[in-house]
Amino acid sequence: NKNLDVLLEQVFKHAAHYELMLDFHVDEGLEPEAAAFDRIVDLTHQFSMAGRVLCGHACSLSVRPTDEVSRVISKAADAGVALTVLPTTNLWLQDNQNGTTPRLRGLAPMHELRAAGVPVLLGADNVADPFFSMGTYDALDVLRNASIAAHLAPADWLDSITTNPARAMGRDINEIKIGGSADFILIEGNSWEDALRSPKASRQVFRAGRTQSIGKEAA
């Protein structure tokens, strides 16, 4: 889009004026020249909107030169931009060529982003639709797939499906502690490995200490 810079700046001007938060689906492709994420990072800094801008996908970061990626990641951390990686969607759609085994994963560099201080979220944006019929909103299943695809240590990335998404939406999430609100999901299993090995295991959802639902896919 030849007018992308102008349009993005207009969006930021309105968001800053009306104190809105912004969410972008950006650079969802494997073209190395795709760099709208960079512009969003610059505008976030320019309009002092740290903590109010969330981007999704940024698949092109996986194929751009390493030095470019390092620079934009550092700038994103300084600007306060968060990034959602959509592992199942990106793995399915990127480098998807009929009859050819994919060689590119299309996943944004999660380890590097996190190491630089960029809040990383995990999510899914294609659920039982023509783009990805096997998609699910189940956050635990998303974490499981991301752990396999990006070699994550699952227990260390729990914030990617809990606190980081909450903060990106401007919400607080209570910790489990004495005197805190007893809002949590109890998953059947003896360890993280059990929970991820059987993502459809029985769950119980608690709100203020009371059971809200019991089932294999409680939400």
Task: Write out the residue ranges for each language-model feature.
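Surface-exposed, flexible loop/turn segments at secondary-structure boundaries
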Residues: 61-63, 91, 128, 192-193, ...
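Short, basic, glycine/proline-bearing loop/turn elements
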Residues: 57-59, 87-97
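C-terminal cap of metal-dependent C-N hydrolases
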Residues: 158, 178-219
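Short, well-ordered secondary-structure micro-motifs
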Residues: 34, 65-68, 95-97, 132-135, ...
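Histidine/acidic residue-rich metal-binding segments in metalloenzymes
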Residues: 1-54, 60-82, 99-122
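Short, ordered loop/turn segments at secondary-structure junctions
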Residues: 27-28, 88-89, 125-127
